[in-house]
Amino acid sequence: MTAPWRRLRSLVWEYWAGFLVCAFWIPDSRGMPHVIRIGGIFEYADGPNAQVMNAEEHAFRFSANIINRNRTLLPNTTLTYDIQRIHFHDSFEATKKACDQLALGVVAIFGPSQGSCTNAVQSICNALEVPHIQLRWKHHPLDNKDTFYVNLYPDYASLSHAILDLVQSLKWRSATVVYDDSTGLIRLQELIMAPSRYNIRLKIRQLPIDSDDSRPLLKEMKRGREFRIIFDCSHTMAAQILKQAMAMGMMTEYYHFIFTTLDLYALDLEPYRYSGVNLTGFRILNVDNPHVSAIVEKWAMERLQAAPRAESGLLDGVMMTDAALLYDAVHIVSVCYQRAPQMTVNSLQCHRHKAWRFGGRFMNFIKEAQWEGLTGRIVFNKTSGLRTDFDLDIISLKEDGLEKVGVWSPADGLNITEVAKGRGPNVTDSLTNRSLIVTTVLEEPFVMFRKSDRTLYGNDRFEGYCIDLLKELAHILGFSYEIRLVEDGKYGAQDDKGQWNGMVKELIDHKADLAVAPLTITHVREKAIDFSKPFMTLGVSILYRKPNGTNPSVFSFLNPLSPDIWMYVLLAYLGVSCVLFVIARFSPYEWYDAHPCNPGSEVVENNFTLLNSFWFGMGSLMQQGSELMPKALSTRIIGGIWWFFTLIIISSYTANLAAFLTVERMESPIDSADDLAKQTKIEYGAVKDGATMTFFKKSKISTFEKMWAFMSSKPSALVKNNEEGIQRTLTADYALLMESTTIEYITQRNCNLTQIGGLIDSKGYGIGTPMGSPYRDKITIAILQLQEEDKLHIMKEKWWRGSGCPEEENKEASALGIQKIGGIFIVLAAGLVLSVLVAVGEFIYKLRKTAEREQRSFCSTVADEIRFSLTCQRRLKHKPQPPMMVKTDAVINMHTFNDRRLPGKDSMSCSTSLAPVFP
């Protein structure tokens, strides 16, 4: 409900009450007594608490005077009061004073506030049926039969619900409850029962008994890192706790205190405004109502005159909750008495046990009353007389003082109304002009020592990506900082006992405010500290030295096809040639007349002899002609299929040849994490107590579990830091598992190292803060702003870009060297040598036959043939003559020449002359 609506409703109630009084009760005012008496019993004690008791008495007088001056409430009637003072815990004296006031004819008794005294007075009022007005919290058992009372203090069950709703709104998962006395356990029973219904862990502690020194307890909570604490105590004790917490160094932004007292607004909180502590409380005084503010100001003026010196720890002239409740109680009694003008008041005697005749009627009027007072809406439960319907303001300490941040009511629950004060695009309220301690670790290129000829001090000693990021954040948020290296040089990991080390421990112990480093955001770390949004995303990968390029073989031209394919091609060649030979012998269309000029010749010839069939297949495979063309359909089908086969094979070979001969293949023994896990020759590991090690340690994937088992079984597999791991990778057969961003930086500067495979996982680097730190959200907003402005990318380019490695020769196609295709020259040379040897064999074989035919010596025949061959100008020679000449007009029988003909000659000349054997 908004403040203007509450103010309007307050004015409506006030005017409505006045209207009722004027319209209905004034005509009957003649029957009213001219004087109405009420009684007030207040505890009094010597010492520093006397001023508080006097404040209640002052409020009693103050409210009566206000009513008497406002003639619309009790026209023609004067409200008088009787005040009695008693000592603390003196119930006998309280009983006696109550009887004295009843004898005076009071219509109601207000107070006392202390438990045993309250019970004594309540018993008397219940017996004589006189309303008893209570103003302090009091436990009422379920079997309580007292009905002549109302309590203006909010019901404890509702207050406990309000505290629980606030804790849930703050998303607390753990808290410490500190109570003053045993009644606190009753008041906070809803909160104490929360762990059984909600995911909240509570630790219960009690303040020291009979002592105001809470420092031992505060020290114990500080040592136990209990940062979220709920104090159930009086405002006096709250003031002492705040002072002692300040002395203990606990008034920082990491602590959040909730005080259940409704008088937190009355404390002097000036010393804590700029401490950054999170201080939250409740307020029932409706200061948003202008009418209430006017009454409070009038009270302050009179209070300062009556008591110039305020109680220690309180603001001067402030109206406490008890005083406001007493003010409202007096007004309610006056208004209710106005509604019953025919009542008469008698003097009552305690020893006679004779009740007031109109007491029950008057008590019902009070329980049915509705009033908008200083403490907001006042409505009583008609059965119990408790105040169960009310509004509570949620107040929080800011740099400008206490501010209202929300409203709670039993019907509507908690409604947070705080609006962040934005100054442009950045929210910098709690970081401006603050000095923060920043912990970090040396890690290139994130944090490095700056190289300089002169000695550097402070933050000037460092440079790197994280240092630039820290400068940008400080510029946006307006804070200053001091950089400190973590003592153990570790990022932060949890041991088997649950203890942390490294930067995480520094944040947990509040030795640092921020951890600005390549700190990986993990689930385990999130349970101990808070993280901002990631400023860089990455993943785990493998760093390994570059493999050496393989020396190419002179027979590299065979690599495009596997040995199996080469064998299959050879078998296909042999098979097709043989099938072609057989089919050609069977097909009648492959036989033709060898002598078309001789019609009577009975000799036919077939071109596809076995050798010619092999020659046809070889010519097709080599994409060359053989001058042998199939004539039959069957042989043409074989030829066509073979040509298609050779087309695909040669095209595939040609396409793959370029890749194999122009790109030098880099053979690495590992290509992925699976390859690492399957072997034991190459040792691998990670930085000890780092996020990468934790990833493998906590992983449930079988491959990573196997890798962690290998690393944990060999202590030498884990290195102390990245530098040690890099050096080991260069000098030994070792692979380092690390973040991809670091690998990218290293490989830009060391050309002997490379990244193997892709990313094993995906994660991010974030800025760490202590759990519950108010700086986290503001740093996150600043990081998002830097990301939108592309400054994060610019900073990464600045620190990651190195001189770079020279372009590798295998990145582009280059001229082929003899080492890659020298084998083809060897094959050519071998073919030439083979052809020479075959030619020599043919030469010797033919000349031996010629010498026998001509009956000449073999040597002379060889000499003549060599002499003729060396005569390069002559193109013709005489055919060797057999012993017996053949007639010139005889038809040459093809069987004489073993049925042979010259290839490609479909017809022969019919000349009677002899054709030369060697054209």
From Swiss-Prot:
UniProt-listed Gene3D superfamilies: 1.10.287.70, 3.40.50.2300, Periplasmic binding protein-like II (3.40.190.10)
Signal peptide: 1-31
GO biological process, one term: regulation of membrane potential
Regulation acting on activity, per entry: Glutamate-gated receptor activity inhibited by spermine.
Phosphoserine: residues bearing it: S869
Binding locations of L-glutamate: P518, T520, R525, A691, T692, E739
Annotated membrane topology: Multi-pass membrane protein
Glycosylated position list: N70, N76, N278, N381, N415, N426, N433, N548, N551, N752
Organs and tissues of expression: Detected in whole brain, cerebellum, brain cortex and hippocampus.
Residue ranges of the TM segments: 564-584, 637-657, 821-841
Paired cysteines (S-S): C99-C350
GO cellular component: glutamatergic synapse; plasma membrane; postsynaptic density membrane
This protein's UniProt keywords: Cell membrane, Disulfide bond, Glycoprotein, Ion channel, Ion transport, Isopeptide bond, Ligand-gated ion channel, Membrane, Phosphoprotein, Postsynaptic cell membrane, Receptor, Signal, Synapse, Transmembrane, Transmembrane helix, Transport, Ubl conjugation
Complex and partners: Homotetramer, and heterotetramer with either GRIK4 or GRIK5. Can form functional heteromeric receptors with GRIK2. Interacts with PRKCABP. Interacts with NETO2.
Protein name (Swiss-Prot/TrEMBL): Glutamate receptor ionotropic, kainate 3
Organism: Mus musculus
Organism placement in taxonomy: Eukaryota, Metazoa, Chordata, Craniata, Vertebrata
Encoding gene per record: Grik3
